[in-house]
Structures are given as C-alpha cells and as structure tokens.
A protein has these predicted regions:
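Hydrophobic residues within alpha-helical transmembrane segments
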Residues: 20, 98, 173-180, 205, ...
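Alpha-helical transmembrane segments and their helix-entry boundary regions
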Residues: 11-15, 92-93, 156, 170-171, ...
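Membrane-interface helix/loop boundary segments of multi-pass membrane proteins
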Residues: 148-180, 223-228
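Specific transmembrane helices
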Residues: 2-146, 174, 244-294
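Hydrophobic/aromatic residues in alpha-helical transmembrane segments
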Residues: 106, 157, 214-218, 270
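Transmembrane alpha-helix/helix-exit interface in multi-pass inner-membrane proteins
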Residues: 104-113, 149-150, 169-191
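Membrane-interfacial alpha-helical segments at the cytosolic side of multi-pass membrane proteins
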Residues: 32, 156-164, 192, 246-247
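Functionally important transmembrane alpha-helices
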Residues: 196-265
C-alpha cells in the first residue's frame, strides 16, 4: 500500500475510533438513566466512570496507535517529545501562562463593565491557606484534559497532519474535530458547555469556534517547542484551571459568556501577531519533519 494512503487510513481510523468511543461512553449514563446532575471528572458518582473513561479516548487511542503503527525509534521519540522538555518548551509554557492571564484580565474587565461581580479566586485562596492544595488542583487539572487528550490530539494527530506550509489549515481542522468531540458535555449540567448552550445555543456552537482559535495557539506553542508535546500539557492545564476553572472560581454568568468571545479574539490575535515574528519563523525552520510509520 502507498505510504500516503496508509497514513490517511490510519488517521481516519484514529478519528472514528476516538470520537465514537467517547460519544458512546459519555452518552451511556443518559441511555442508562443515571443521575448526571453533578457529574464531572472529579464527582465520583457512577456516571463519572463513563464520563472519565470516555474523556481519555484521544490519549488512549493515540498511544495504542503509536505503539502499533510507529517504528521503535518513533515510539522512543514520541515519549521523549511528551516527557522531556527543551528550552523552547519552557518559553512556550511561560507564553501560555502569560496569554491565559491576560485573557482572564480582559474578560473580567469587560464583565465588570457590564455589571458583573468580582472573581472569587477560591482556588488561589485555598492554596494560600494550605499549599498542599496546589498538588490537588495540579492533579485534577492535568488528568482532566492535558493527559487525557493531548497525547492523542497534539501527540499522534498533529504528528500525522503536520505540514509546515499548511499549519493554519491543519490547526483549524484539528480544532474543529476537537470541538465536536466535546458534544456529550453539552448534556451534562455540571459542564460549562451545558451552561453556554442553555444561555443561547449559538453560544454553545461558538465553543467549537473557540476550540479552533485555541488550536492556533496550541500549534504555535508546538512549533516554538520544536514539536514537543510537553508544553501543550501546561497550556491545556492553564486554560482548564485558570481561564474557566478553580483558580478564579466562582465567576459570574457574565464572565462565562464574555470569556468565549475574548478567547476567540485574543487567541486569533496571538496567532496572527506571533507567527509573524522572527522568533517564530526561526523556530518553524528548525522544527523537525519526520514520519515514523512502519
């Protein structure tokens, strides 16, 4: 079989298995009539078992595909890119943290202008009282998105699609796939996607657009780190626990609406501006191109 055709078939198979298994598992509690009112990754109810296992499908499927379809050198390199940072990784992590903090600031300034309450910062307050809470939030923050998804989305999927001359198209495609993969979350009352859809279905659909704009930032960090997946874990972590998570909770309904628009605009602006810098262009030139398929 032609290697290009083989790569395409493997890619399509990965997407079909990942999306269908996630949807099957995360819709199963509703099919079984289980109580999902408070279900989340950390709720410890029976429905959360299906919810959690469904959520790890991108990573689980991606790792299996790497083990099955990559050469031994490819497997070693995959693990190294996931767990061993380089200088670019550290720069990408700092840029990610800075971008997310600016997005929080802008979102809250707009929200306050619209009459919203101040942010609660309960997570930060808990850490200030007991620093051990830092590890609690770090644990749930890492497994609730970074580890459960990014070995697949940015590890395997981006590996298969990476083309230096088509990074914009690739990023938007991955972001769209990533967005629709979240479909079951619209039906779980404890998830912010459910809140958005209840406020306005259009707002719920804009979440997919926000995934596409976020994917532009993810790809930028991926390039800066010379295709390391390591810093992507932190970008996803920062978005989960800072932008709309425990560090700033509770936040107003106004904030939860405004943040969607701010994230889309600022992520897009970051991509447009940063990808025109000499720093990024040099990183792109140095980013390795490889294909480890057997």
């Amino acid at each position: 079989m032609d290697k290009t055709a083989k790569s395409r078939r493997i890619l399509i198979l990965y997407l079909i298995i990942t999306i269908l298994l996630t949807w099957l598992l995360q819709f199963m509690p509703m099919i079984l009539g289980l109580d999902i009112e408070n279900t989340s990754i950390s709720s410890f109810d029976f429905a959360s078992l299906f919810f959690g296992i469904g959520g790890v499908m991108p990573t689980l499927t991606g790792v299996i595909f790497v083990l099955v379809f990559y050469t031994k050198d490819g497997i070693k390199d995959f693990l190294k890119r996931c767990f061993v940072p380089n200088k670019g990784s550290l720069i990408a992590i700092l840029l990610s943290l800075g971008l997310i903090c600016v997005e929080v600031f802008v979102t809250q300034m707009i929200s306050r202008g619209l009459g919203a309450a101040k942010l609660g910062f309960e997570g930060l307050k808990l850490i200030a009282k007991n620093p051990l809470y830092f590890f609690y939030f770090l644990f749930w923050g890492i497994i609730s998105g970074p580890f459960s998804e990014e070995f697949g989305w940015r590890g395997f999927l981006t590996d298969r699609l990476f083309r230096k001359e088509k990074l914009l198209q690739v990023s938007l495609l991955i972001g769209f796939i990533w967005g629709i993969w979240h479909l079951p979350l619209y039906f779980y009352p404890a998830q912010i996607q459910h809140d958005w859809f209840m406020i306005n279905p259009l707002l719920g659909l804009l979440f997919i657009v926000s995934c596409m704009s976020a994917a532009l930032v993810y790809m930028t960090m991926y390039v800066i780190a010379k295709r390391k997946v390591f810093p992507i874990f932190f970008l996803h972590l920062f978005k989960n626990i800072i932008l709309t998570g425990a560090m700033i909770y509770p936040f107003s309904d106004t904030y939860s609406v405004v943040v969607v628009f701010v994230e889309i605009v600022m992520d897009t602006l970051f991509y447009v501006i940063f990808t025109r810098t000499l720093f990024y262009k040099k990183a792109l030139e140095q980013a390795p191109e490889f294909d480890y398929l057997k």
